[in-house]
Design a protein with these regions (language model features):
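A short N-terminal interaction module
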Residues: 2-113
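SAM-dependent methyltransferase catalytic region
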Residues: 62-90, 94, 98-300
């Protein structure tokens, strides 16, 4: 009598983020970039591919195209494309605050060490961004009323989280879809010097508001400006009730004009996070709140 074959579960096991990180690091090492410029182009091309696949997963109504961005790109091989798709499929199993952080962390991981160091690029885990927003709320921040800015918003860790809190407030829940979109456009803003990181942030906010935009019949206007916060602050006419974020760290050389502008807060070498604090105080409403992730050296 023939034995019946044993039924087996052949569904592949879902990889962990640590396993994907290992593959991303291996991909970076095998990429054979000959210059920092090529490394940056690869980091952006791979991250762009992940975001495009992620958008395809979210855009089930096929209503909106993913926002476009002009960038120097590097052609990806079939393995890199498959890995990008797998990562996007993994992200969609998480909540948006988690994969917003992982998206920024992945982009940072792929960037050259020198670029990260020179630009003070770090991304904020959801536990820290949520904790900082809780502290601001305890001090009186009102996510349904206040105008909020993240002056270094690359990766979207704070803009996405604040937008989610705005949408979760009972007063905002009562609004129509179009009113919710208009509220976000009026009350939430970001500034980011890295054009690609700004695009990631804007696209993540688009994903968060996808259902509202479908119901309203229009897209969210861009809420992220591509600018250097330190340099643009003199011409910034908007004022904010809450300024929150994780500003870049690291010493910076200033030209004479910029040093004069920030002279009130300079003691010895200029540090980026110190300049961001000064810049933020200049555009803060009277009685407003600033909440930043800062190094312990800030405490003296």
């Amino acid at each position: 009598m023939r034995e019946m074959p044993i039924a087996m579960d052949i569904c592949p096991r879902q990889k962990t983020w640590e396993e994907y990180k290992y593959e991303i690091e291996a991909l970076k090492k095998s990429n054979n970039c000959n210059s920092e410029k090529e490394e940056i182009a690869f980091a952006r091309s791979f991250s762009f591919s992940v975001m495009k696949f992620l958008w395809r997963n979210v855009n089930y109504k096929k209503r909106w195209e993913c926002r476009q961005i002009k960038m120097v790109s590097k052609r990806l091989d079939i393995y890199a494309i498959r890995l990008a798709k797998d990562i996007a499929d993994y992200f969609i199993t998480l909540n948006i605050m988690e994969y917003a952080y992982l998206m920024g962390a992945m982009y940072t991981m792929l960037l050259p060490d020198s670029y990260r160091s020179d630009n003070g690029v770090y991304y904020t885990p959801p536990s820290i961004s949520e904790r900082l927003l809780d502290l601001l709320a305890a001090e009186g921040a009102d996510w349904a009323e206040d105008k909020v800015l993240d002056p270094a918003c690359g990766g979207g860790a704070f803009l996405v989280t604040v937008a989610n809190r705005m949408l979760g407030d009972y007063r905002i829940k009562e609004l129509s879809a179009i009113e919710k979109i208009e509220h976000i456009e009026k009350h939430l803003s970001g500034i980011e010097i890295d054009r690609f990181a700004a695009w990631i942030t804007q696209t993540l906010v688009d994903i968060l508001l996808y259902s509202e935009t479908i119901a309203a019949g229009r897209r969210l206007k861009s809420i992220v400006k591509v600018q250097d916060t330190i340099q643009c602050i003199e011409t910034e006419t908007r004022r904010f009730d809450v300024i929150v974020g994780n500003p870049p760290y690291g010493k910076i050389k200033l030209d004479e004009e910029t040093r004069k502008l920030y002279s009130r807060s300079l003691y010895g070498h200029a540090n980026l996070y110190g300049l961001f604090i000064d810049a933020s105080l200049r555009i803060l409403q009277s009685g407003g709140l600033v909440g930043f992730v800062t190094p312990t050296s800030f405490l003296g």
